[in-house]
Amino acid sequence: MDSVAFEDVAVNFTQEEWALLDPSQKNLYREVMQETLRNLTSIGKKWNNQYIEDEHQNPRRNLRRLIGERLSESKESHQHGEVLTQVPDDTLKKKTPGVQSYESSVCGEIGIGLSSLNRHLRAFSYSSSLAIHGRTHTGEKPYECKECGKAFRFPSSVRRHERIHSAKKPYECKQCGKAFSFPSSVRRHERIHSAKKPYECKQCGKALSYLVSFQTHMRMHTGERPHKCNICGKAFFSPSSLKRHEKSHTGEKRYKCKQCDKAFNCPSSFQYHERTHSGEKPYECTQCRKAFRSVKYLRVHERKHTGEKPYECKLCGKGFISSTSFRYHEKTHTGEKPYECKKCVKAFSFVKDLRIHERTHTGEKPFECKQCGKTFTSSNSFHYHERTHTGEKPYECKQCGKAFRSASVLQKHIRTHTGEKPYGCKQCGKVFRVASQLKMHERTHTGEKPYECKQCGKAFISSNSIRYHKRTHTGEKPYKCKQCGKAFISSNSFLYHERIHTGEKPYECKQCGKAFRSASILQKHVRTHAG
């Protein structure tokens, strides 16, 4: 039997052409080529391995190796297969006598953006291949996952998807032992160990492992967001972000946790959630050994060591280590708050903040401390609380060496050195170091007291005030002095008390140099100078 060279049935792209394809076009290409090779095998054809094994920078050649691996995963046989040809029809007929060539009438006149992709995705050697190809236009997905009902165009796609449910991870990293569902995933992971990052940004010097990551990164500098939601018009840096967002409109949540029944719309969120049950933190910082549940949070953490702030505000020039903090900041300029609570009409800049706020109405506190059983409405509050048990204070002030449990508390502290008070009251002009202080102050003008005690009906201007007040009913005093054993209702009272033992007086009068244990006592003292 004659040997069939890989190139006889392959679509060829240059590196430049491949880089221009969007992910959906690349995925279509992969699926079709996998099916093609299976079909050739089933009818007894052989192909030349030299192309599949060839390691080269060209992504297409690396893809050949991937196809070879995927082919070995499946024993499924097919009677006929799709052959995408790069030669004219008459040449094809000479190579494969008696085989008719079919052309798609649906896509024959539709341009996909690249002439080579246009040319190759239209011609087929078998009628069954044309039928398979037709699904890309009709949207037909006949292969369905038995676990979650998600549908796919190809049987190979549903088999790969089913591994998410089965937790089957046959591909293991030789360096760290981490297991993966697919060979492509383990190869991506191995780059973490090899530190091979061939794509370097000329603007900030950051190096990236993948061309797609590099292109997405460049959009942070240019501000370009080419992927737009057809429903609400919101734009995104990458197609994967757009896909995740689109599911927020459909309400589709295919990935369900077996432990708590919580559902998710994407597998990465589902895997991250599973680790909250298992406690697994597979991503470790090489500098401080701190571990994280996702590689995304590790990358953000690493920037604290390097000082890198790749997200820069075009309005004020301020830099940020994460896209989340950058987006939060952007909305301080616009004042945009599109997410509104249906119960109290309070509005938020981000849907995540709305979800956390809604828990104040429902009473839901999904984050529980394993040491003391205390529960929290948000993961941030929970992580901050955990550090009260461990004593961990990872955020250190470079000026005085004082350490803090959270980055936000450190930022507030830094302003005691700089004197910066960026939050000003529009009614009286009084300025504050933190936004929460301004909000509480504004309520002294409006008379608003949104936090009411259910036991006695007393109302308060802040959540902290009502929390401390509730402890007068319960008798709870969670802050205990290690030196004398005295306990306190609030952290402020506790800190003030600690200074009696240490002698610390951090609040100093600028006029006479006298120092005090608390800001309130300093303010009283300052008035004695004013007369």
Swiss-Prot record:
A GO term for molecular function: RNA polymerase II transcription regulatory region sequence-specific DNA binding
GO CC annotation terms, alphabetical: nucleus
Superkingdom classification of source: Eukaryota
Keyword Zinc-finger set for record: yes
UniProt xrefs under CDD domains: KRAB_A-box
Keywords from the named record: Metal-binding, Nucleus, Repeat, Transcription, Transcription regulation, Zinc, Zinc-finger
Protein name (database record): Zinc finger protein 878
Residue ranges of domain KRAB in the record: 4-90
InterPro entries with a match to the protein in the record: KRAB, KRAB_dom_sf, Znf_C2H2_sf, Znf_C2H2_type
Location(s), subcellular: Nucleus
Summary of the function given for this chain in its UniProt record: May be involved in transcriptional regulation.
Organism field: Homo sapiens (Human)
Zinc fingers (C2H2-type), renumbered ranges: 122-137, 143-165, 171-193, 199-221, 227-249, 255-277, 283-305, 311-333, 339-361, 367-389, 395-417, 423-445, 451-473, 479-501, 507-529
Family: Belongs to the krueppel C2H2-type zinc-finger protein family.
UniProt GO BP: regulation of transcription by RNA polymerase II
PROSITE patterns membership: KRAB, ZINC_FINGER_C2H2_1, ZINC_FINGER_C2H2_2
